[in-house]
Amino acid sequence: MNVNSVIYYILFLFASTILAADKTSSSVSPTLVWVTGTDANGKLATTQSTYYQSFMSTYTTAETPSSGSIGLGSISGTVGEIRTYSMTTISQGNGGLSKFNQNGLEMKNLSFVKLIGVSFIAFISFILLI
């Protein structure tokens, strides 16, 4: 095997992975996470584990509150009163995706970008074979 064949094979595997990622539509999503703990000898160890996050089905019907209530259960208070909190948590929703979605782009539909990426890989592979 020459060097060009090896490079072509690696690029082919990379392109296949990109195309395969576009076809999945599962509700279970594996994520690699790093977990730190102690091993059997009591020493600190960090290992990589696969975390699976699954989502339960949602229901189309919802409970309707009885007449005269607003459906908040045991929450009570005065309307219009300013509330104070002893702790405030500020976080950015969706990790880094909020800026991406504000620009009118959707993370779910990147088929065109993947097509461009695969085309680029095919072009480079063709150049290497010449």
UniProtKB/Swiss-Prot annotation:
Query: What GO terms fall under cellular component here?
Result: extracellular region; plasma membrane; side of membrane
Q: Which UniProt keywords apply?
A: Cell membrane, Cell wall, Cell wall biogenesis/degradation, Glycoprotein, GPI-anchor, Lipoprotein, Membrane, Secreted, Signal
Signal peptide range equals 1-20
Protein known as: Protein KRE1
Q: Is DNA repair tagged as a keyword?
A: no
* Location relative to the cell: Cell membrane; Secreted, Cell wall
Q: Tell me, in one coarse class, where this protein mainly resides.
A: membrane
- Name any Gene Ontology BP term: fungal-type cell wall organization
List of glycosylated residues? N109
Q: Which domain of life is it from?
A: Eukaryota
Q: Which family does it belong to?
A: Belongs to the KRE1 family.
Keyword field contains Hydrolase: no
Q: What InterPro entries does the entry give?
A: Kre1 (IPR031452)
Q: What does this protein do?
A: Involved in cell wall 1,6-beta-glucan assembly possibly by the addition of linear side chains of 1,6-linked Glc units to a highly branched 1,6- and 1,3-linked glucan backbone.
Query: Which membrane topology describes this protein?
Result: Lipid-anchor; GPI-anchor
- Naturally occurring in which organism (per UniProt): Candida albicans (strain SC5314 / ATCC MYA-2876)
